[in-house]
Amino acid sequence: MNKKPARGASAGESAWNRARSLGTLLGRLASLGHPALEDRNPMFRPADAEFPDRRAERKLRLLMCACCRRVWDVLPEPARAAVEAVEKLADENLPDKELDAVESAAYRAVPQSVWMVESHPHQAGRWTAAAFVQDVIGYTPRCLRAARVTKEEQAAEEQAQCDLCRDIFGNPYRPVAFDAAWRTSTAVSLASQMYESRDFGTMPILADALQDAGCGDKDVLDHCRDEKQVHVRGCWVVDLVLGKS
């Protein structure tokens, strides 16, 4: 979902809002100082490892998982297990044995040649999940190609991936100073339920709770109330409420 540039928006912000390529968005995030987005091996790394931008790395993991979940129905079980493991790894550590097991299983689920993505569209989902494991760069062109089920749907899939990115990372040109007073028990409860269930149908109610707590930030409230806005685990507003951003 492309948004019209805000009045007085900088050239960078306008480009962010207009971008239709996930690679372009991630490139802009990297240029703004997110070291995790330049990292070549972010996915199966221990959550307590020392890296300069742990929160950006977590969001990158959740973004790649959200892209994979778009083709969940065609993913083989080992690939699904890998995605679920990476989601868990975003918020907690996994035992080394468990991590090694799901990574190995995901490797075995990888189709052996890229032509399968083009020749057999339903293999695209398998390659999507495997790409971040095998190539360890979830945002490479190969992964983008993989997530597109057919050539005719490429533009729509690119747009969907951009929507996911904007939902997770927010607008880097308009950082929100989140007041801890907005983090009421009602707001936290709503956000926690949505985060765990992946059902974000109560985002408008979260907006009401935040507003009742004194939040007047237009970007926050509009993000919650926009009926066309996609929301996934890692949503920047939900993360702010839960103290994950």
Indicate where each model-derived feature is located.
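Structured binding/interaction patches within domain cores
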Residues: 2-245
